[in-house]
Amino acid sequence: MTAVPPSCQILDGKALAQKMQGELQRDIAQLVAQGHRSPGLAVLMVGDNPASAVYVRNKEKACEKLGMVSFGKHFSADTDQETLTAAIASLNEDERVDGILVQLPLPDHLDAVKLLHTIDPSKDADGLHPVNLGHLVRGEEGLRSCTPAGVMALLAEYNLDLTGKNAVVLGRSILVGKPLALMLLEKNCTVTIAHSRTQNLADITRQADILVAAIGKPEFVTADMVKPGAIVVDVGINRLDLGEGKSTLVGDVDFAGVAPVASYLTPVPGGIGPMTVTLLLANTVASYRQRLGI
């Protein structure tokens, strides 16, 4: 990792994820010792996307480490919508399953939105069902979208006061940008969502006390776009080809350039990525507790 000046503190998502997973592991062990079953997470994967396969394996390993049961469902790339809908319906009824996740992206012939809508909202481990998003809009309790919730947990861990701060979110996806804007609003930030059609983007980002990049463009945010002393959160994960069969992971922020300007900065890897997986597990345990009334 690039050397970071003393004026910039790294927001260490990997360390917090390990801490939170340790707490979940102890929680689960205690509940199982009391005679309860282990929490169960079902992950549905369609096709053989290499990146998706890695993500699924990581989630299954994390489940095993925490004492959770993983119900992996792997379907061929030509599986039709009806088969997947039936599989989700079966998992909705399965009392061993507390969380259901459909690994994205799906093959083009499948309607991901319709599939996500068929998941029982109480088992929506990813927090993307319209019912759970509706709870977020209304400020009610519910399962939260994993990546935005991971961002908020990381900011909270460092006791960063968000009240009254100007927050700019780059990206308006339903996965990150929109729910994160709502979560920042809950913490009394003044929130701006910027996107590909935003004019005078750098003028807007330079007003941000908190700048979140979630657009999937490698090292898009440069030092001249950042307000001195800002909190910068990099949600992007982009693989850059270095040639000769080598590659590296970078975020949406030019880490080396922005570190001397920001007061807090998340690294890639080791920032928001580990938090996303951890919040997925936390959602599953929360669903498990609710379903068992414990």
Curated annotation (Swiss-Prot):
InterPro entries: Aminoacid_DH-like_N_sf (IPR046346), NAD(P)-bd_dom_sf (IPR036291), THF_DH/CycHdrlase (IPR000672), THF_DH/CycHdrlase_cat_dom (IPR020630), THF_DH/CycHdrlase_CS (IPR020867), THF_DH/CycHdrlase_NAD-bd_dom (IPR020631). It comes from the Bacteria. Pathway: One-carbon metabolism; tetrahydrofolate interconversion. Homodimer. Belongs to the tetrahydrofolate dehydrogenase/cyclohydrolase family. One of its GO terms (biological process) is tetrahydrofolate interconversion. NADP(+) binds at residues 171-173, 196, 237. It comes from Synechocystis sp. (strain ATCC 27184 / PCC 6803 / Kazusa). GO terms for molecular function: methenyltetrahydrofolate cyclohydrolase activity; methylenetetrahydrofolate dehydrogenase (NADP+) activity. Disulfide bonds: none annotated. It catalyses: (6R)-5,10-methylene-5,6,7,8-tetrahydrofolate + NADP(+) = (6R)-5,10-methenyltetrahydrofolate + NADPH; (6R)-5,10-methenyltetrahydrofolate + H2O = (6R)-10-formyltetrahydrofolate + H(+). Keywords: Amino-acid biosynthesis, Histidine biosynthesis, Hydrolase, Methionine biosynthesis, Multifunctional enzyme, NADP, One-carbon metabolism, Oxidoreductase, Purine biosynthesis. CDD domains: NAD_bind_m-THF_DH_Cyclohyd. This is Bifunctional protein FolD. Its EC number is 1.5.1.5, 3.5.4.9. Catalyzes the oxidation of 5,10-methylenetetrahydrofolate to 5,10-methenyltetrahydrofolate and then the hydrolysis of 5,10-methenyltetrahydrofolate to 10-formyltetrahydrofolate. One of its GO terms (cellular component) is cytosol. The keyword rRNA-binding does not apply.
